């Protein structure tokens, strides 16, 4: 989660293009899929090559004794804790710009991959034979923070202030939300319900107790058929 100032530009209306039927491109029956796979492979190869020149993939060289490859909000934490470090900020993480990453890795003495959750960038970088430090010290769990960097890289034991002793406030649907009425009826009927990701997932908790499954957006339909 993050926030920051936003500068709005003039609205640009998209070009109204007529629909053109193209089953060879859009209907992935086996014969078409085999042909289209060549286009996908070519596109990915060009993206990987051209990605090294994209402005959204930016190498910031400062102190080359330490370097970070990162993306998204973790970049802000790196800049906060290591303002003088060299940083490769990736705006496009798939496919990764191999040439740019290799050049960056050669110019820094110690390389860290600072990415939240799964080691997507890290595993690819290591597969290219580039030495780096990632999930050996950084967790796969939850959101990262500047304090995590201080603790794992600098060895600083950062003391955090305890939360004030406030009464617990469990998540609930907003007052007036129409989902409340829907779930109340479903609860009275004792119906099993398959849900999607969204605020209405709160229908699973008391006092509504309706939603039985939630996997991802759109999964409720196929899950319901399975139930």
What do the PLM-derived regions correspond to, one by one?
Residues 183, 192-227:
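Thiamine diphosphate
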């Amino acid at each position: 989660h993050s926030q920051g100032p936003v500068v709005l530009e003039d609205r640009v209306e998209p070009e109204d293009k007529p629909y053109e039927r193209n089953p060879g491109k859009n209907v992935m029956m086996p014969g078409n899929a085999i042909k289209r796979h060549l286009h996908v492979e070519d596109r990915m190869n060009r993206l990987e090559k051209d990605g090294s020149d994209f402005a959204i993939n930016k190498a910031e060289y400062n102190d080359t004794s330490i370097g970070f490859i990162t993306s998204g909000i973790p970049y802000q934490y790196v800049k906060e804790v290591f303002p003088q470090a060299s940083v490769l900020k990736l705006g496009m993480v798939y496919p990764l710009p191999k040439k740019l990453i290799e050049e960056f890795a050669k110019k820094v003495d110690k390389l860290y991959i600072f990415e939240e959750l799964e080691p997507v960038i890290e595993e690819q970088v290591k597969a290219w034979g580039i030495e780096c430090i990632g999930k050996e010290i950084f967790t796969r769990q939850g959101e990262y923070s500047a304090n995590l960097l201080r603790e794992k890289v600098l060895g600083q034991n950062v003391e955090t202030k305890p939360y004030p002793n406030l009464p617990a406030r469990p998540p609930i649907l907003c007052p007036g939300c129409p989902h409340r009425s829907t779930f109340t009826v479903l609860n009275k009927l004792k119906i099993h319900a398959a849900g999607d990701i969204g605020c209405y997932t709160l229908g699973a908790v008391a006092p509504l107790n309706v939603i039985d499954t939630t996997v991802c957006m759109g999964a409720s339909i196929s899950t319901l058929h399975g139930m």
